[in-house]
Amino acid sequence: MSDQAPSVKPPAFGPGVVVKGTWHPDYAEVLTPEALEFVAKLARNFGERRLALLERRKTVQAAWSKGARPHFLPETKAVREGDWTVAPLPADLQDRRVEITGPVDRKMVINALNSGANVFMADFEDANSPTWDNVVRGQINLRDAVRGTISFTAENGKHYALNPKRAVLFVRPRGWHLPERHIEIDGKPISGSLLDFGLFFFHNAREQLARGTGPYFYLPKMQSHLEARLWNDVFHLAQAELGIPRGTIKATVLIETLPAAFEMDEILYELREHSAGLNCGRWDYIFSFIKTLQSDTRVVLPDRGQVTMDKAFLNAYSQLLIQTCHRRNVHAMGGMAAFIPIKGDAAANDAVMDKVRADKLREVKNGHDGTWVAHPGLVEIARDIFDSHMKGPNQLSNKREDVKIGEAELLKVPSGTRTEEGLRHNIRVGIQYTAAWLGGLGCVPLYNLMEDAATAEISRAQVWQWIHHGASLEDGRKVTLTLFRDALGEEMGRLEKEGAKERYGAAHLERARVLFEQLSTAGTFEDFLTLPAYDALEAQR
């Protein structure tokens, strides 16, 4: 069933609450008057503060674009140097050695919960294209998953259901910047963050507690401890409204923006009643590095395949994250292995799996307490590495007091080369992912990697950076608009020969090309691809 399918008119809800999206009868399972009144209360209490924090982002970015650089905040020095820890974690969050992530699609939810991972992060954010149907059905799917009743029968007759032993569920709502235009509160679109969090929490928190677990979340894209403070206040109100003890909610924050890396202690402190640690978000972090320092000619990056977690600013922030979390007695989660198994080519598959092993070995030896994978086929590989080197449930006792990371290390640019193939790869991947996203898919296998929105962001950001600063390729040529547009035309021809029109739809592919070209060649850097892409998604309804 899709957004465009015939539907009935949405029912009337409470004062000021309007559902503008299409309506299917089963939407009433989660879009109840009580649930929408709950999210309306969140919106009325926190909506203006959210918008003010988004305005603050613009002000801070303007200063960086004029030459200022991110730094540790002098006004929060006492927090960084203080002797405090976060609240104790529940039993089912002590061992998180392997976590799998994926969209809220019904079959994928079942497969991820059955994957053998310790945790499944169900994603309303980067792995989900936020069509109205995807958003609402994702909530239905998770409600059924929490109750153990979720099942799915594919067109070929294959039946999917939950195993008795399954992963602990986390949910990632959308970031603070994303609106949800299909629900208005007092004439304004609700925050996607508050809707995703609010609906899930309202329908499932008590049920999860009754089943011996709890409402656990991943929080994305934050840029400051003030944004973490907002989440903490949301949690307080939500728990009070449902009569659930304060501190029941636990949340892991993704450190996937450069500014947040300078405020990790502060973010943990703001969420200290609710914290379940921090996580390294690689692709978005690289994207944020480019965005934050967009005017600085000294930070033009090499091909993104050369910007790896063992290099320069990425290595520095991952080490500092471990030290910070363990000092506060909470988990430091490693990053994503986005590789997917390669069928029909044993040698290529072995090479990819060796890369995964090396990445996970680096993480566990550095002191991470767990790691992410994007495909069930990688769960066992990641688990074997962590089992061999992490004998207890976690490594919180490894305080990494040897780590000495300052502002210079967090801003250090890795050495490497820029190539025409690197440019073309960004074009191919960015356009294909965006085309799939416009077609309602947020999690897309491309060139043996499971890609999400962070991939499209880093692709267009890097192309913009190279063009904007006239970066030199390894053969001496400058990256110009002409070079980019010539490559774009040739890559579109290649994609069409490879069947991209049939795979994604000709209209989606063309919209993706236009959007990618606009963002890559704009005079100013667009904050998020997903904002104009959401406009395009809505325009085709």
From Swiss-Prot:
A UniProt-annotated Pfam family: MS_N
GO CC list: cytoplasm
Top EC class for this record: transferase
A GO molecular-function descriptor: malate synthase activity
Key words of the record: Cytoplasm, Glyoxylate bypass, Transferase, Tricarboxylic acid cycle
Enzyme Commission no: 2.3.3.9
Alphabetized CDD domains for the sequence: malate_synt_A (cd00727)
Record carries keyword Cytoplasm: yes
Catalytic activity: glyoxylate + acetyl-CoA + H2O = (S)-malate + CoA + H(+)
A Gene Ontology BP annotation from the UniProt entry: glyoxylate cycle
Family named by the database record: Belongs to the malate synthase family.
PANTHER family per record: MALATE SYNTHASE (PTHR42902), MALATE SYNTHASE 1-RELATED (PTHR42902:SF1)
Name of the protein in question: Malate synthase
Recorded name of the encoding gene: mls
